Amino acid sequence: MKKNRLNLNGVVVINKAKDVSSNKVLQQLKYLFNAQKAGHTGTLDPMATGVLPICFGRATKIAQYLLDADKEYIATIRLGIETDSGDAEGEIIAKSPNIPELSAEYLETVLAKFRGDVVQIPPMYSALKYNGQPLYKLAREGKTVEVKSRNIKIYELELLEFDIDSLKIRVKCSKGTYIRSLAIDIGKTLGCGGHLIALQRTQSGPFKLSEAFRLEQLKDLSFEQKIASITNIESVFIDKPIYSLLEEEKDDLYKRGLFADKPHLDGTVRIYDDEKFVAIAEFDKGKLINKKFFDQDILISE
């Protein structure tokens, strides 16, 4: 371990550049902040840009919350050409001259098929594993296996613009959604095939592109400005309801890890003690099923 690394705690929201891997962004940020511990919250493909939250220190304990959070993307689909990976980085495997005449009305009828609860098959070029092997490694070896479908939700699917052979869409979706698969499926529905040529993540959980930093921006900041760019752990849960501890509940929670049933609570809840955020609790119909404590007042801890 590098001497004198800093024990930072919190989240930095990065606007990832194109053609850079998520892991490279993580390592560069860790070096830039001289941080002891850091982790990202789900990879963006190298060709993709946009929101990539990086967790420092204790915030790595809640990375799963961001992995499970809803996401929003802007995607551009090229019609009439299919690739083995479903995006512009793959090899062309099929071409079709039969691109239908596009109109806003026609495309709306197509996109309507993909809103709501959707069954999606992830692409072979993905990090999902088959018998312990990542699918993308099998794909690079020319192997094809049956990939299990998964249930996803597409909350919003909006047509932004289109041309004779392409369309740009905005997608708000649940975890586990592959935009490459969506591009492939839209191309199939149009009868001409298609692949993803551009992808930008505009939101991950509560974090939006407007609050994200480019790595180049952070490199030019002073130490104090870099620290100020770290948002506290509570920011991950800013959209969750708050429960303020009663005085008689504090000993049970802090000393014995107990919490009386709360019939009115369900899902993820922020726990406050004297107007201070101290924990995240998971409730299932009023019963406490999980909790995590945080001391998130200081970004640099001893």
UniProtKB/Swiss-Prot annotation:
It catalyses: uridine(55) in tRNA = pseudouridine(55) in tRNA. Keywords: Isomerase, tRNA processing. The keyword GTP-binding does not apply. It is an enzyme of class 5 (isomerase). It holds the Pfam family TruB_C_2. GO terms for biological process: mRNA pseudouridine synthesis; tRNA pseudouridine synthesis. InterPro entries: PsdUridine_synth_cat_dom_sf, PsdUridine_synth_N, tRNA_psdUridine_synth_TruB, TruB_C. Responsible for synthesis of pseudouridine from uracil-55 in the psi GC loop of transfer RNAs. This is tRNA pseudouridine synthase B. The gene is truB.
